[in-house]
């Protein structure tokens, strides 16, 4: 393994060591999005469209790990475990998987996991990770709308919807509802201007009403800002009760 930079505390999350092996001499921990403003600065330096940034830049791999290891999704995964605690081997689709941090963790917890994302740098990085871990898990490139993905018990989709245009947001929510019996998806709304130009502005209630008009749906808010407004909302919906 190459010698890699450490963070200020002298410790680096193990997933970054995987990325260091993957990138070799191109590894640079300074690319890690240590705070929200850094993500915006990285995005601005790259230029191009959001889709091009997601598909092409190596920065995305650092930011994906940084965000996935901060524990933001813990309450969502706790609810997933509570729903599926007596159903070992449940089939779970990690949709918009990025580097697959959540899906890989769920695999080691006993779930039968598959991954789906657009074809780009993060999907290639995920393929490398699975090979390095000797995991034979399915990966689907969702660029083709007619792609047949086997029906799942649960689909999870975290930190994805805010990157999509309003039309594609609804298309994705519908597609997820057709892929699994139960869907867990979070909605992210930035409380300030930090992510302006990176995230779409989401209307939580409008999207909740949209999903509720088609499926049974529960909604729970998380991470209130200084004014008490939630920065995230978890939707659980589908054809079975959560």
Which residues does each PLM region occupy?
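A conserved beta-strand element that flanks and buttresses the S-adenosyl-L-methionine
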Residues: 156
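Hydrophobic adenine-recognition pocket in adenosine-nucleotide-binding enzymes
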Residues: 160-163
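Class I S-adenosylmethionine-dependent transferase superfamily signal
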Residues: 176
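Conserved N-terminal segment of class I S-adenosyl-L-methionine
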Residues: 1-150, 170-173, 198-242
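Conserved acidic residues
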Residues: 90, 153, 181
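A short acidic, helix-capping loop that chelates divalent metal ions and anchors anionic groups
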Residues: 191-196
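Conserved beta-strand signature within the Rossmann-like core of class I S-adenosyl-L-methionine
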Residues: 180-190
